Design a protein with these regions (language model features):
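Short helix-loop boundary/capping segments
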Residues: 78, 92-166, 174-177
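Acidic (Asp/Glu-rich), glycine- and aromatic
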Residues: 65-90, 175
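N-terminal leader/pro-regions and domain N-caps
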Residues: 1-39
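Acidic, serine/threonine- and proline-rich intrinsically disordered appendage/tail regions
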Residues: 106-130, 165-237
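Short, solvent-exposed beta-strand/turn "edge" segments of beta-rich domains on protein surfaces
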Residues: 42-53, 63-70
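Solvent-exposed serine/threonine-rich low-complexity stretches and specific carbohydrate-binding patches
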Residues: 89-95, 183-184
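Long, low-complexity, largely intrinsically disordered segments
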Residues: 35-43, 109-111
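Buried hydrophobic-core signal for structured, non-transmembrane domains
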Residues: 58-62
């Protein structure tokens, strides 16, 4: 399992539980040149506890480990807990460019967030972007040593959610459920995924970001673009 940011949808936007401070000299330089070091910046943000905003993208690689084979018959989001959107620091870097392709998705606001087919003729944010229950009509068999890669999107419109993936597999004549999180580099245990909806009003008016304690905005007047501090009480996109 690994994260796969889609900058065409997510841009460089991140949220934090608290402050982005303190910042070292190197941290400040990375913020100042974030658009020129996108991968490094995103890894740095995740390492500081940064949380995806509105949507998370990831790739799940499942490998067959039984001689007789297994079959993936179900996948759903296992919610640990949800609450109000994060209002610590927001790094606001809206997207520019095309979005990538995704296979299945979870709507974390659903009462039962099963894996749903992403409609290829829809864009993120469109009505019916997520369609039918993917595994209602699909079963994925895995032979010993065979890999299957799932491109996954998870969304929320109104909450902060902490969650895992529950994978249902048919093996040795019965069903088993496997709970999957992600493993931070250098960490032996797995952690839950996190995603938060934006807490601001999204109306483009002055003061619409005032709910945040800190705000950093991507300044595209420079090349490469970087983040500069802004007053959340007065900033307007």
């Amino acid at each position: 399992m690994f994260f796969d940011r889609d900058n065409g949808i997510q841009g460089l936007t991140w949220a934090l539980h608290g402050s982005v401070q303190p910042l070292s000299v190197n941290d400040r330089l990375l913020l100042k040149r974030a658009a020129g070091s996108v991968t490094e910046f995103n890894e740095w943000m995740r390492g500081r506890g940064g949380v995806d905003v509105d949507v998370s993208f990831m790739k799940l690689i499942v490998t067959g480990q039984r001689q007789a084979g297994v079959a993936i018959i179900d996948m759903r989001a296992k919610i640990d807990h949800c609450g109000a959107p994060l209002i610590g620091a927001l790094l606001y870097g809206p997207p520019e460019g095309e979005q990538g392709n995704t296979q299945i998705g979870f709507d974390l606001d659903d009462s039962v967030p099963v894996a749903r087919q992403v409609n290829s003729d829809k864009s993120f944010g469109d009505r019916d972007y997520l369609g039918r229950d993917y595994f209602k009509t699909n079963t994925t068999p895995l032979a010993l040593g065979q890999d299957e890669v799932f491109s996954i999107v998870a969304t929320t419109r109104s909450r902060y959610c902490v969650w895992y993936i529950d994978l249902g597999v048919f093996v040795d004549g019965h069903r088993q459920d496997i709970t999957i999180g992600y493993k931070p580099e250098g960490n032996q245990g797995q952690k839950p995924f996190e995603v938060t909806a934006r807490a601001d009003l999204r109306n483009g008016e002055k003061g619409s970001f005032s709910i945040y304690r800190e705000l950093y905005v991507l300044d595209r007047r420079h090349d490469p673009a970087g983040f500069v501090p802004a007053d959340p009480r007065t900033y307007a996109p």
